[in-house]
Design a protein with these regions (language model features):
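Acceptor-substrate binding/catalytic loop of class I
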Residues: 174-188, 226-227
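A short acidic, Gly/Pro-enriched loop at the edge of an enzyme's catalytic core
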Residues: 111-122
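A short glycine-rich, Lys/Arg-flanked "PGG" loop and its adjoining helix->strand segment in the class I
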Residues: 136-148
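A short SAM/SAH-binding and catalytic strip from SAM-dependent methyltransferases
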Residues: 121-134
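Conserved class I S-adenosyl-L-methionine
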Residues: 1-50, 64-68, 151-180
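Conserved Class I S-adenosyl-L-methionine
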Residues: 3-4, 28, 35, 62-64, ...
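Class I SAM-dependent methyltransferase SAM/SAH-binding core
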Residues: 54-112
Length: 264
């Protein structure tokens, strides 16, 4: 089983607490070239939801979406934020407790959702469906708990996401590590969703990274589940990136991110 779908690895190591995710979020916040902001852009997609919407987020992580868009959350929305990791739920609670909107935090596996049929107006599953071992079961469960006019929002990455970084990692590792084949991407996600949702739309978010801090980029690589480099290989990366920074003033890395909207 791949680490990316190994529930024990995900809950006990990669996402035992928010450390690894915080490292990755920080680099996107600081060095993304699109000043509008990823979370603002995602939140724009919620504009058609009712004023009293009931919303289920699966794989909420640290709750960064709601933290970043706190001022935009309608007062009558009912949010249920779920994750399989106790550490992530604790981080989300700490980030959002001051909002005081009656947000529920619950430990839930997307393959077995403990809510009644037709409960929610919307489901959100951002950057997490490639962690699900049985996505068909998860899609069926999400569909079941959505109302007849409900919608699933699901963000993921495309084939070119962080391409240059993976190329550098591939080279210094002698081909041992590189870009991994995610099981739910911008290229293959629509077909998977259409088995359960008749209408699926994809929007892409234009962005890239211009990184000026080598230490943060090294920390990003260290945080990744799919990459295990030796200290010698890390030093090679650090040297190469430092040279690029001196020569070009920044390290350019492509981003390829987008959002599916799947309607009942």
């Amino acid at each position: 089983m791949s680490k990316l779908t190994d529930k024990e690895y995900l809950t006990q190591k990669q996402y035992k607490d928010s450390t690894n995710l915080d490292v990755r979020v920080a680099i996107h916040k600081r060095f993304s070239t699109n000043s509008y902001g990823w979370f603002n852009w995602v939140f724009d997609s919620f504009s058609a939801l009712p004023e009293n919407a009931t919303i289920l987020e699966i794989g909420c992580g640290t709750g960064e979406l709601w933290k970043e868009c706190e001022s935009r959350i309608p007062k009558n929305w009912a949010l249920t934020l779920t994750d399989i990791s106790d550490g992530m739920l604790d981080a989300a609670w700490r980030n959002l407790i001051r909002i005081h909107r009656g947000i529920k935090f619950e430990k839930v596996d997307s393959q077995s959702i403990p809510y009644a049929d037709k409960t929610f107006d919307a489901g959100i599953a951002n950057y997490m469906l490639y962690h699900v071992a049985d996505r068909k079961k998860a899609f069926a469960e999400i569909k079941r708990v959505l109302k007849d006019d409900g919608v699933l929002f699901s963000a993921t990455a495309g084939a070119n996401h962080l391409r240059e970084m993976y190329e550098w990692v591939f080279r210094v590792s002698g081909g041992r590590h590189g870009q991994i084949a995610l099981q739910f991407t911008l290229e293959n996600g629509k077909e998977q969703l259409q088995e359960f949702f008749p209408r699926v739309e994809l929007s892409r978010y234009p962005d890239s990274l211009q990184i000026t801090d080598v230490d943060m980029l090294i920390a990003y690589v260290r945080s990744m589940a799919s990459v295990e480099l030796s200290e010698e290989e890390i030093q090679k990366l650090e040297q190469e990136w430092s040279e690029i920074l001196v020569k070009d003033g920044a390290i350019h890395i492509s981003k390829d991110a987008g959002l599916f909207q799947a309607l009942q």
